[in-house]
């Protein structure tokens, strides 16, 4: 995984998308992937994103609200790797998975949700976390594509 990531960083640098030392960039990314969090932590991260970057418990603004559209767009299009499109079609939720089996998903202005449960599928996403989040989101009406019947 680190070797593939380093190769990706070198490729992005060659195209002018990354400045600086590829080894340092990969080290920083690897350390970010190694941060220990639990489901409650991930849920608070997701809730903060759903609340336009403001922590719903502390009221502290942690992410610039102007950055939220870009963050959610990247989550929607790449957050579940090769299955991002399938996930978005099924749930309508921007999401991000991690190699430890965690997934966060966001219904902007409504809720953020998280689940952790290995094992991973072929795309690198938790099988059970996907199912749990999809089921809970459906029960809460989180998919904006299913918000109202079409043609009525």
Q: Can you annotate each of these PLM segments?
A:
Residues 4, 33-41, 63, 128:
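Short, contiguous, pocket-lining structural segments
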Residues 11-24:
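Acidic-glycine-rich active-site phosphate/pyrophosphate-binding loop
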Residues 7-8, 42, 99-103:
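Short glycine-rich loop/turn motifs
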Residues 48-152:
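Structured C-terminal helix/loop/strand segments within mature extracytoplasmic catalytic/sensor domains
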Residues 31-33, 120:
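A short glycine/serine-rich beta->alpha loop
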Residues 1-10:
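Single conserved hydrophobic/aromatic residue that forms the stacking wall/gate
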Residues 23-31:
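Flexible glycine/proline-enriched surface loops and loop-helix/loop-strand junctions
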């Amino acid at each position: 995984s680190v070797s593939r990531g380093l190769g990706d960083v070198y490729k992005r640098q060659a195209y002018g998308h990354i400045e600086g030392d590829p080894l340092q960039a990969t080290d920083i990314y690897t350390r970010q992937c190694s941060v220990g969090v639990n489901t409650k932590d991930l849920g608070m991260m997701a809730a903060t994103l759903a609340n336009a970057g403001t922590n719903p418990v502390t009221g502290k603004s942690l992410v610039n609200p102007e950055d939220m559209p870009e963050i959610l767009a990247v989550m929607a299009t790449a957050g579940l790797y090769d299955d991002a499109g399938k996930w978005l079609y099924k749930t309508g939720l921007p999401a991000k998975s991690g190699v430890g089996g965690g997934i966060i998903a966001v219904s902007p202005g409504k809720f953020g949700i998280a689940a952790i449960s290995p094992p991973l599928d072929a795309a690198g996403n938790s099988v059970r976390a996907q199912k749990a989040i999809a089921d809970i989101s459906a029960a809460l009406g989180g998919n904006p594509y299913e918000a109202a019947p079409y043609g009525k």
